[in-house]
């Protein structure tokens, strides 16, 4: 971990930013309705990416929220590309 969070701190940060997953899913709601994909699978992929984003976050490179949202959007692109 670049940020020095303990596991407990990391988990708390992840819980505080779960709303980011919902935000990204709402932004891609039209695609999710049109694609044959289970929203629970998408949520799980985004949740794993959220944990990884918090683990790899470097405070010297910007705000945590922006980093998390960019990582979740990248994960959504990856999920979409696997459905093509």
Please identify what each model-predicted range represents:
Residues 1-84:
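Alpha-helical promoter-recognition and RNA polymerase-docking modules of transcription initiation factors
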